[in-house]
Regions:
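Vicinal oxygen chelate
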Residues: 13-16, 31-32, 59-63, 69-120
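Short N-terminal helix-initiation segments at or just after the protein's N-terminus
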Residues: 1-9, 28-42, 73-81
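A generic structural micro-feature
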Residues: 2, 46-49, 82-85
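Short secondary-structure boundary segments
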Residues: 1-15, 47, 116
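Short, solvent-exposed beta-strand edge segments and adjacent coil->beta transition regions
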Residues: 5-7, 52, 86-90
Length: 120
């Protein structure tokens, strides 16, 4: 039975830029930065000789988001179907005003893949 969300993980192309965005713009707290490699992480992620850099950032309520940068396999050198697997769908935050939050993110370097549509 699910009782809560432990954490979410999203793949980013550059960990340092992602840390800046999530801590300075979204204002999450940086908890930890670490590197992982070896047989264990290779088995979990399903890639031979996997090497990743990970930063944990936390919301004010303690929800953890893992920002993951792949070192090996390199997303640029992976086959197209593998590149698609080195991503995450999305992450959703509860906010007080969605339109203001959207505009704030765009003004501070956020990218919208589609025009925003706000529902009443």
């Amino acid at each position: 039975m699910i009782i809560d969300i432990n954490h979410s993980g999203i793949v980013v192309p550059n960990l340092e830029i992602a840390i800046d965005f999530y801590t300075k713009i979204i204002r999450l707290k940086l908890v930890e930065i670490r590197e992982r490699d070896g047989a264990g992480i290779s088995q979990v992620l399903g890639y031979k000789d996997t090497q990743i850099k990970v930063a944990d950032v936390s919301t004010s309520t303690g929800q953890i988001i893992e920002l993951i940068e792949y070192i090996n396999p390199s997303p640029q050198n992976a086959k197209s179907n593998e590149r698609a697997e080195l991503t995450a769908s999305h992450i959703a935050f509860n906010v007080t005003n969605i339109q203001e939050s959207y505009e704030f993110l765009i003004q501070n370097g956020g990218i919208s893949l589609n025009p925003a549509k706000f529902m009443e």
